[in-house]
Amino acid sequence: LLSAQVHAEDCEETQAKLTRPFPNFWGIDEHSTRFVPEESTSISAANVHRLKLKWAYGIETNSPRSYPLVTENTIFFGDSGAGLLALDRETGCVKWRHKDSRGNVASAILSRVTESGLTLYFTGRREGVFAVDATTGKTIWKATITQEPVPLYSGTPLLADGKIFVPISSEEVGLSINPFYGCCTTSGGIAAFDATTGEQLWYLPTIEEPARVIGRHFVFVEKWGPSGVPVWSAPTYDSQSGLLFLVRGKNYSDPATITSDAIFAVDADSGKRRWVRQFTEGDTFNMGCLINCPNCPDAPGPDLDFGAPPVIASNGKDQQVLYVGQKSGHVHAMDPSSGEVLWNKHLSRGGYLGGIHWGLAADEKAGILYVPISDYPSGGHSDLPAVPGMFALNLHDGSVLWKNLKDTSALDGFWPGLSPGVVAAEGLVVAGDLAGGLAAYSAEDGSVLWQFDTAKNFTRVNGVDNTGASIDSHGPLIVDDLLLVASGYGGVNMQPGNALLVFQLAQEKVDTDDSSAPEEQAHE
């Protein structure tokens, strides 16, 4: 049962308290560790078993792509069907709706204190970057790049030093399924905007060479290249060096470039590239390859690019290291100053959805790099077994400390791979999976401390039918005594759903009858 029963959809009290917004980065901090410190959460390995479902909100789209921002009494979340929402933290009622972003919200919600108060920032998949007043829900500014004709804003921006850095991909990855579309001409990139005014400060494309006609099909349809190299995910920032670190995707068309499937270091002030390190050569692939469309390159690559933001963490030897996870199932450790590879670890067969898909997490104090493995059975190294599950690596040398694999031997239902981003806190890491499972794993040995099946119907707090399904993309968030997750992700043949679920630590039961019976857990 929900601790808060069905409420009216709109709140009577709409005032948002805005002094403690969290988090302000997709990766929790500028280094993208996805580790929530003790001062920001009371959830730990000792009490995570007390998590209970507080309320469920019915999203108006069946493929939620947002990651929440939480304050003292408000949850800001992007419902692509309704736009950015300000929800009451206690009941889930709606304080305001930002209708300008309806149908578009695609990122985590970020915030920054300005002269007029708290400003929220996020991207719409096709509309660009929004700056919104957190008190009123009114648009302050909206900006798009002009350098590319069909940009796609699929990654979360990063706020630093009065600027907002926006990753850019391209709609051509999907347009390529149209055999009469001349694929492809566009490049991914990263753009910097003034966070106060929305003025574009610089733009760095991932491909500097302009596209040219490289052939034809159907006699008259021109084939173009090079193209692609999208930036799917949030940048990582190191304020000491002033460098942004970006992961790059595949080329959409021939010829392949040295910038695809690569890691970039970029000067945050100038937008100049500092170094680039490519890991997979010749990876040219687009959605047309899935249906034998003539826009597919003549010799398509494996589509084993990078989707997870880089992580900066200490390796326990007083050295800052850049850790990146690839869809191929590899983890690479690099020197952030030069791009030199320190070590790499091949964990799994990989595939179109990973391998490592959306994100890693790092607990520097424990010396652990958490690596979720999807190994969705499509693409990848077919000669290797699939090993979906959670891996814990030693930050120093990449050795496996422990692993907890999903049992797929008698699979009855959807693939339970760990594709979404994960989040860690003291003594634990929390991960969702493509079958709708949500679990907290012990940092010590990987044992499951708490679990919950989100792939079902929920009693809703608003007027929208509410069903959980695949968990993907941004994954769960831990803040204060809450755990939040969007369940249902209808992209790439996954199970669609529309539930925003909010869990809360229940009060510890007082033993009044001297019984030794264990407390009932909130798992199913």
Task: Label every PLM stretch briefly.
Residues T144-Q147, Y203-G225, R274-G301, H346-G351, ...:
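Surface-exposed loop and turn segments in beta-propeller and other repeat-based domains
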